[in-house]
Structures are given as structure tokens and as C-alpha cells.
Amino acid sequence: MELIEKHASFGGWQNVYRHYSQSLKCEMNVGVYLPPKAANEKLPVLYWLSGLTCNEQNFITKSGMQRYAAEHNIIVVAPDTSPRGSHVADADRYDLGQGAGFYLNATQAPWNEHYKMYDYIRNELPDLVMQHFPATTRKSISGHSMGGLGALVLALRNPDEYVSVSAFSPIVSPSQAPWGQQAFAAYLGENKDAWLDYDPVSLISQGQRVAEIMVDQGLSDDFYAEQLRTPNLEKICQEMNIKTLIRYHEGYDHSYYFVSSFIGEHIAYHANKLNMR
């Protein structure tokens, strides 16, 4: 991994690395925050998945998470949201193509050559983190919007691999929402059964489980009712007896003003779980 940015932050280092991804067949950037204690010992890892139009920069520059990661001794890994490059398929819209990988493995041309974000996040990136950084095997996952969707899907499909999961403003029923329907039709085709592998509410209804789910949702979020549908997640978790910590916040929208207001509580939540044995 090639170091392309290095910034001192709260006694640790906010770095950005570039590497060639075998899963995605392109160069990828990834942000890695190494807290002060990473200089002397191995630490657990929190993976953060960003939302539509984002890259690796949004979370590391806007959330203020470094203060809390340093306090709680957690490495934070923030990858890009899709494969990148002039040779990678794209669309002239913000919710499909580059910047909108949806953390799935595409099966339809032209997307299936590069869009394997599920494999990248689940397998390739953790292997690289273990190889290059002082990381323990204990990891958790979180994200925002499309990234909250990705975090929930990865945790629900791989409950033994992630200690905990949380999300800000996630797309919880993508097969029922315009963003998800349009992306899934392009990436996965018209067989809607394939869509359900990347739909958190559907996965839970099929019996997939995690110990607990933490979600924060702003009630002034323009996408709340049509795209996000947080109450659907709350309802299915109640029906399937999955413990939740779902909080609704008056006045907060879909932006990083919202994420930055509560990211400290999410990192503390994951730190508590990661440090339990």
C-alpha cells in the first residue's frame, strides 16, 4: 500500500493509502486512522462505509471521528464507495456507477467486471489491513446512507465476522425504495430474488441475525420517508426479537452535520463491544 497522505491528528495519524484491488481491478484509495496506541500495540478496527457520491475523504475530513478513535483506541478504516478509473463503467447520474457501488457484487454487464464491492469490503480490504497495520482480528462496521445499508448487509450476512454494527440514516429496504430499485436493476438484473441478498429487512425476515443493531436517524432528513424507511427495520427487528438501539432526532438532516453530532457515541458503542471478551 502506497502512503499518499499523512496528517497528525489527536496524537495519531490520519493517513490515506493507494493500492491495486484484485477484486475491483483498479487502483483504490482508503483512509486509515491510526490512534496513538497503534504505535505500540495491536488494536481493533472499525470499518466505515460512506454514502452516495462520497469517496474516502468525506468521513475522514467531515466527521471529527479522530478525537473519539484516539480516545477509545480503535483503528478506523474508511474505503472509497466504488471502483474508480476511466476504464471502469460509469453512469451520468449520482446514484449509479462510480461513487455509488452499493457494496454489492454486480452480476450484470458492464458493471460485473469491476463492481465487486461486497468482496472487497468483506475479504480483500481486511486482509490488507491485517497485513499492513497493527490490527487485531476483532472488527466492527458502520456507515451512512448507502454505507449504512452496506454495513447492515455485511454484518447480517457475516455475523461471526463483525463484533458490532451501527448505521446513520441507512437504506433499510432498498428493494422497496427508488435508490435501491434502480441500482439493483442495473447491477443485479431484473430477478428480484437476487436483490434480497442486499436488503437488510429481507435478510432479517429470512432469519439472518446479529446480536444488536444501533441506528441514528434524523427526522428532518429529506430522504427519510421515501428512501430510508427506518421504521421498517425497527418493525422487523421487533418481530424477529433482535435487540435494537434506534434513535430518532428532531431537526437533523442527512448531512455530515448529523453524522458528526453523534459519531462519538457510535465509536464508544463499538469500543465497548470490541473490548468485551
UniProtKB/Swiss-Prot annotation:
EC number in record = 3.1.2.12
Q: Which residues form the active site?
A: 145, 221, 254
Question: Does Protein biosynthesis appear among the keywords?
Answer: no
Claim: Hydrolase is one of the keywords in the record: yes
Q: Report keywords, A-Z.
A: Hydrolase, Serine esterase
Say what the protein does. Serine hydrolase involved in the detoxification of formaldehyde. Hydrolyzes S-formylglutathione to glutathione and formate.
- Of which family is this protein a member? Belongs to the esterase D family.
Query: What's this protein's name?
Result: S-formylglutathione hydrolase FrmB
Species of provenance: Escherichia coli O9:H4 (strain HS)
